Amino acid sequence: MQSIIGKHKDEGKITPEYLKKIDAYWRAANFISVGQLYLLDNPLLREPLKPEHLKRKVVGHWGTIPGQNFIYAHLNRVIKKYDLDMIYVSGPGHGGQVMVSNSYLDGTYSEVYPNVSRDLNGLKKLCKQFSFPGGISSHMAPETPGSINEGGELGYSLAHSFGAVFDNPDLITACVVGDGEAETGPLATSWQANKFLNPVTDGAVLPILHLNGYKISNPTVLSRIPKDELEKFFEGNGWKPYFVEGEDPETMHKLMAETLDIVTEEILNIQKNARENNDCSRPKWPMIVLRTPKGWTGPKFVDGVPNEGSFRAHQVPLAVDRYHTENLDQLEEWLKSYKPEELFDENYRLIPELEELTPKGNKRMAANLHANGGLLLRELRTPDFRDYAVDVPTPGSTVKQDMIELGKYVRDVVKLNEDTRNFRIFGPDETMSNRLWAVFEGTKRQWLSEIKEPNDEFLSNDGRIVDSMLSEHLCEGWLEGYLLTGRHGFFASYEAFLRIVDSMITQHGKWLKVTSQLPWRKDIASLNLIATSNVWQQDHNGYTHQDPGLLGHIVDKKPEIVRAYLPADANTLLAVFDKCLHTKHKINLLVTSKHPRQQWLTMDQAVKHVEQGISIWDWASNDKGQEPDVVIASCGDTPTLEALAAVTILHEHLPELKVRFVNVVDMMKLLPENEHPHGLSDKDYNALFTTDKPVIFAFHGFAHLINQLTYHRENRNLHVHGYMEEGTITTPFDMRVQNKLDRFNLVKDVVENLPQLGNRGAHLVQLMNDKLVEHNQYIREVGEDLPEITNWQWHV
């Protein structure tokens, strides 16, 4: 095909004069990056450096900074030359100064933070605030214009970058991958993400592996293997690597500029060919391996040992602050080596010749709208979830699979948003297993590798489902990148294995918390997580697949951000999920069932229940407005089944016992109103649970979580049954028995907490013990649960 070379404006043409300007710009970025580490005053060294100009405590990092400033300067050139829509994602840890320095130089920072102006006072504030109490982080934190990846917990940069370009055909994400970061599990698997990028409908990712050779105190693996081995590694992963290696700035500027022109034109040519010819075959996308010294341009030796090109450059290269001035002269020499007098005018502003190098307006990477995704967010079109209602003539009379019913609703969400292409489903090869079958009626899995029919199923070059990579890390990272750039989606996975990404969820929650306090950061769509194949539904999976701990992990996070829902049936799930899709800036966790399950609520009942989050189920209660003898509560699908079964036993054997049944769908309702926005007042809580009557609580997760949530409540007569880390491959009911969540143990607990029952209670406890023995004998002989368990029906 015809090349696009020569079809762009001459601006950015590689000449010795232009490269000298880029070098000057790079020096300016390096200078103020060092200044942010050390300086409180005298930011351009217009007088001799003195101890009083220094911070009292120097905190921050240097090693990755100059290499990234080098990359940033050269990306600015190709953005202007090719009129690119590009964002910058930084993966290395502690690279905070990079985007701060560069966004300050191009003016974005001062537009976002007018108090950090482009003059003497602004430059002093810029330096003071870095890693300073009341200031900014040493990472590319949410406060940093242009950032969508903080780089604190490492490994997610490439996944975020791919998520950002899904359905953004004109966007290029320049993703700098640290060579230390490249050793993490999530990053190591992210190189495979190129197998899912459609060159017609998606944008492009340009990975730039920054090989500076060292981590905190160790060499990096990829920097120490032979070049041909490294090249083959990336070629084997489907990339076309270009190497830019060296330490002489003049040579490196020319090589980097030439290489960026080549890879940019390759990307644009790939896209042009794909879009003109509807060619979705997987291309060999280019990438860059940039090998430069760690701490490049910094002190070569400190205290007689190597610094530049050594692990010693990782953090603060020179130990110097207001109280320790032995290295003050060396710091001054280092700062002056950048020749700030050539770079800034008399008003402490970057000289016009260098300002001209930066893109303008939203073409600046720090000002790109995709890096503030809430600005681009469009409301998701959703059908009326009530149209998907399961008919429930009487409680328990209908049996359905909740996730199958949800799949019908999700199918139509996909259909309604086909033209906007702003909704995706992510999962690690579990969409079919998790019963979202109906979704495949309207879309397929996006997959750019070979398709072998009829052996394969539902694979296509273009689809709304991205679930063909068995990596929870990559799926979560893709979804986060997709959300951060202004779209919608959800991640459905096995409950136990969502724990694999619980730390990623934590990091995203931190991002949401901070950005919610920044007026210029607009709210993004919520992170919606569906945890199914849950702890109580094991079948062939067993002990390894049992972990409901994500609930506790979520609860500990900022109450303004996190929500946890445990719908007990399909209508409740539909109402909850629709609600979650319309929230913004939240983490919504839904724990749900996928197996055949009795249905309890009509759609009207479910809507009211979800709106309240917690309610008395009158049809399962017989206290009828009186003070109950006991409250039986449930939270979760299986606990609700067993709690209702326990109620039927109590009604049969102790008909005079006044039982109140309370179901919890919004777990945060259990918290006091001053601890969570969804929390109940003490008055409302006591109206449900009384102040002193025994509460037998059947819970989906670990029992201590309910004790934690209700710690400040008046009624301490609470007895929680939940998961006790017991169970293996066994029958569904035996899982409950082993963890004492079954109906028989619940009834025993009721009786044991009502001593007034006397002999009547003792006989019922004996009957329950007999049933437990019968159960154990039966499953070991027959291999399935007792007929009275499998055929149980709700009745009063």
Swiss-Prot record:
Top EC class for this record: lyase
UniProt xrefs under InterPro entries: Phosphoketolase, THDP-binding, Transketo_C/PFOR_II, Xul5P/Fru6P_PKetolase, Xul5P/Fru6P_PKetolase_C, Xul5P/Fru6P_PKetolase_CS, Xul5P/Fru6P_PKetolase_N, Xul5P/Fru6P_PKetolase_ThDP_BS
CDD domains assigned to the protein according to its UniProt record, in alphabetical order: TPP_PK
Enzyme Commission number, as recorded: 4.1.2.-
A Pfam family per the record: XFP
Taxonomic superkingdom: Bacteria
Keywords assigned: Lyase, Thiamine pyrophosphate
GO terms, molecular function: aldehyde-lyase activity
UniProt keyword Glycoprotein present: no
Phosphoprotein among keywords: no
Similarity annotation: Belongs to the XFP family.
Designated name of the protein: Probable phosphoketolase
Native species: Clostridium acetobutylicum (strain ATCC 824 / DSM 792 / JCM 1419 / IAM 19013 / LMG 5710 / NBRC 13948 / NRRL B-527 / VKM B-1787 / 2291 / W)
Organism placement in taxonomy: Bacteria, Bacillati, Bacillota, Clostridia, Eubacteriales
